[in-house]
Structures are given as structure tokens and as C-alpha cells.
């Protein structure tokens, strides 16, 4: 399971999850992705369970990228312990997820949209946040490349 090798401090405050994800909200590696629509904590066990479900479904077909990392320690007190006497010990690690955050990406030559959608659906069941399947639109990608080529040509014409 995922966890940091070392941290500056053993324990953290719980914090608040306000607003939407400003980083990690676009597809960077693959063609298909699973995007969070709610905020919440995703534990290292849930990330691993989702990864296994997707990997088993696609077999050796493509590649999976995990875009979140559990870097927040969650502490717990022992059962039937009286109040007070300090904060509990770190028990597990969570990743703080805000709406819009990309959780997993999938890509490869052999991966079709239907295969990716089904694999992501299996992963959705393992996660505590509401998610949606998104994909890169090929037409949109090609048009953006053409626009950059046109802008480069116009810049060259201006220089001359």
C-alpha cells in the first residue's frame, strides 16, 4: 500500500475540504480518466483495491496511472480509552480529494473506450467519493494542435 517514506511531522490536523481542485484536474498521461465529483478522504487501501480491480479487468492491455497519493496521517485512539491524555497514534494514510481531481488515468494502444469505462466502473465501487469517467476527445486534440501551428505561422509572418 502507498504511504510516505518519511514526513516532517508524525501527526496532522484533520483540516477542511473547501472549494474545487486547482491542481491535478486535467488528463496528463492517458486517454481516459476517473474524476472526483465530491470531496473526501481516499485511504491507501481504497486506492490499492481500485488499482487491483482495474488491473485485473484490463489484464496486460494498457497502463494505469494513479494520480493521488495518501500523504495525510489519520490518528486513532485505542478502543475503550478515556478522554484526554493526548492525540492517538497514526493508524492509516489518506489522500485528500476535492471535486475535479483526477484519481486514475488509463491509456495504451490496446485500450478501447468500452474497456476503460468498465474498468473505471469497477474502481468506482471501491471509492468513497462520487466519480465520473472522462476521456480526451481526439477531434479537440487535433484542432488544438492545428491552432498552435496556425499561431506559430502567424508569429513568423509578423516577424518578417
Swiss-Prot record:
InterPro entries to which the protein is assigned, alphabetical: Ribosomal_uL16, Ribosomal_uL16_bact-type, Ribosomal_uL16_CS, Ribosomal_uL16_dom, Ribosomal_uL16_sf
Signal peptide: none
Role description: Binds 23S rRNA and is also seen to make contacts with the A and possibly P site tRNAs.
Stated family: Belongs to the universal ribosomal protein uL16 family.
Region ranges (Disordered): 138-160
Domain of life per record: Bacteria
Record protein name field: Large ribosomal subunit protein uL16
Pfam families the record matches: Ribosomal_L16
Binding partners and assembly: Part of the 50S ribosomal subunit.
GO biological process, one term: translation
Keyword Ligase: no
Keywords of this entry: Ribonucleoprotein, Ribosomal protein, RNA-binding, rRNA-binding, tRNA-binding
PANTHER family: 50S/60S RIBOSOMAL PROTEIN L16, LARGE RIBOSOMAL SUBUNIT PROTEIN UL16M
Coiled-coil regions listed in the entry: none
Cellular component terms (Gene Ontology): ribonucleoprotein complex; ribosome
GO MF annotation terms: rRNA binding; structural constituent of ribosome; tRNA binding
Organism name: Prochlorococcus marinus (strain AS9601)
Biased composition (Basic and acidic residues): 147-160
